[in-house]
Amino acid sequence: LDGRITDVYFERALAILKAKGVNPVVRAEFIAKGLPGGWRWALLTGMEEALTLMGNLKVRVRAMQEGSVFYPYEPVMEIEGRYQDFIVYETAILGLLCQASGVATKASRVKKLAGERLVMSFGARRMHPILAPMIERNAFIGGCDGVAVVKSGELIGWLKPVLPAMAEQAE
């Protein structure tokens, strides 16, 4: 990502800061003010991608580890640096963390309810194909026992997915 996946107001704010010659060192904390359905906890995922996105930025990052449990108002990440150096990445960072964490958290809750029964991620036919590996990786982190998509299996370190096709089950 090059910063073009940003809310327009960040781009406008950057233009104003540059025009006025203002580039303060700031510290931004990333928190969830609340969780869906009144949930008390969530799983943090998407952090590896967010850190990769910021890898070449001149900022200092402190963050919880991928797969950590977090609570409302608990900072999951802190970025410190000159605001112009990271302002246009805030939208993408939030998107990476929020969607991935939502998938992992929901998978964790489903697995908790399922008890000892297997829970598989098998939704690639109902999502944009580019999203399937990300969604299945985070579902796996959240507790799913298997994934269906080949690329997803590669991302989590399997040579092939562990979810057998229904046709194979019928044999």
PLM features: residue spans?
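Buried, small/hydrophobic-residue-enriched core segments of structured protein domains
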Residues: 4, 68-70, 77-171
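Flexible, solvent-exposed loop/hinge segments and secondary-structure transition points
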Residues: 1-87, 92
